[in-house]
């Protein structure tokens, strides 16, 4: 191969390398630009609960919406089934966060105010206001508290003193055409049962007390037909 031929090969090799590098740089710029454009697309305005939502999410609290605020709010909404998932700090988003804060505050003493009877022995308590449930025996906490998802506006979980009257570990609802594992009925068609969805997903159930699978299973093992259930409070938004 002549020296001229070698120079041509080297020149073409360098040109190909430069083209490859340019293409890689262009691809990276497109990726970065796409990410920036995606973040910038979160353009919800400042909401009425901006400061509260910022504080809950650990964002800088200035009461003014930013792209980063919007993105964080939108992620929270997507996680907990809040629609529209727009990143707006509105009433429903703050309502969900408020319930979570109340649940955290309950700690291991959910009945510190004595609202659920302590003179009936073993009893399952359901606090609609905080969307919490637990099992106690007298003043002793046996299980929980755990988050629950109760009836939405129009199909509220009814309050009062009830008793479990029917149990079916593999119950199938012909009304809703859906499985209701670990179903324990205590008020007509209202039951504790397991669901495969977020406990904070609005607007709520058709009246039943939805539970996470592990919690519904624990209730199944702890409770029996004839055991007391006490439902009190009012679910936010109903």
Sequence positions of predicted segments:
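Secretory targeting and sorting signals
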Residues: 1-39
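Exported/periplasmic cell-wall-interacting domains
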Residues: 19, 40, 104, 108-121, ...
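Short acidic, glycine/serine/threonine-rich helix-capping segments at coil-helix boundaries
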Residues: 40-100
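Extracytoplasmic/secreted envelope proteins and their assembly/folding machinery
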Residues: 50, 54, 70-73, 94, ...
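Sec/Tat-exported extracytoplasmic proteins
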Residues: 57-61, 77-84, 101, 137, ...
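Secretory-pathway/luminal and periplasmic proteins that interact with or process carbohydrate-rich
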Residues: 79-84, 103-107, 143, 157
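A mature extracytoplasmic/lumenal domain signature
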Residues: 89, 93, 101, 130, ...
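A structural motif detector for short, solvent-exposed N-terminal "entry" segments of globular domains
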Residues: 111-154
């Amino acid at each position: 191969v002549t020296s001229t031929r070698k120079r041509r090969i080297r020149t073409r090799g360098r040109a190909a390398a430069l083209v490859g590098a340019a293409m890689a740089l262009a691809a990276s710029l497109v990726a970065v630009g796409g990410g920036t454009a995606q973040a910038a697309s979160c353009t919800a305005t400042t909401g009425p609960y901006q400061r509260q939502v910022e504080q809950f999410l650990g964002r800088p609290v200035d009461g003014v919406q930013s792209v980063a605020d919007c993105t964080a709010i939108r992620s929270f909404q997507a996680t907990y089934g809040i629609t529209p998932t727009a990143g707006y700090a509105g009433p429903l988003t703050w309502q969900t966060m408020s319930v979570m804060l109340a649940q955290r505050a309950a700690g291991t003493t959910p009945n510190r105010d004595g609202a659920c009877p302590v003179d009936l022995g073993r009893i399952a308590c359901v606090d609609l206001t905080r969307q919490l449930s637990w099992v106690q025996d007298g003043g002793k906490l046996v299980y929980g508290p755990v988050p629950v998802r109760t009836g939405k506006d129009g199909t509220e979980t009814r309050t009062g003193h009830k008793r479990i009257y029917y149990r079916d570990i593999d119950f199938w609802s012909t009304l809703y055409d859906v499985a209701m594992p670990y179903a324990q009925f205590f008020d007509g068609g209202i039951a504790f049962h397991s669901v495969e969805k977020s406990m904070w997903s609005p607007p709520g159930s058709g009246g039943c007390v939805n539970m996470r699978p592990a919690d519904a299973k624990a209730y199944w093992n702890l409770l029996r037909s004839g055991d007391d259930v006490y439902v009190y409070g009012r679910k936010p938004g109903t």
